[in-house]
Amino acid sequence: MPQAINLKDLPQAKLKDLLEFPCAFTFKVVGIHREDLVEDVVAITQVHAKGDCNPRQQRSSKGTYNSVSIDIIAEHIDQIETLYLELAKITGVRMVL
C-alpha cells in the first residue's frame, strides 16, 4: 500500500517535483457562512489564474460554514502558493485546502 504524503512535510522543491506544470489544481476554501463568500473566492482566484473557474459550494449540516471548491489550471508553484495566502485572507475564511 502506498504511503500517504503530507504536503506540509515536503520542501518546496519536492512539491515542484510532484506537480508537472501546467496542471489542474483544486482549492477548497472553508469559511463561516455568508452570502458573498463564493463571489470573494472567485474574484481572488481570477486575479491570479487565467481561464474559467467553476466554483462549487456546499453548506455544513448546521449551516454554520460554507465550503467553496474551485478549479484552476496552475502555471507554476508560486501561483499556487500565492493563491493559498490570498484566499486565506478573505473575511471569515477558516482554512484553505
UniProtKB/Swiss-Prot annotation:
GO terms for cellular component: cytosol. Coiled coil: none annotated. InterPro entries: UPF0250_YbeD-like (IPR007454), YbeD-like_sf (IPR027471). It comes from the Bacteria. Belongs to the UPF0250 family. This is UPF0250 protein HD_2015. The lineage of its organism: Bacteria, Pseudomonadati, Pseudomonadota, Gammaproteobacteria, Pasteurellales.
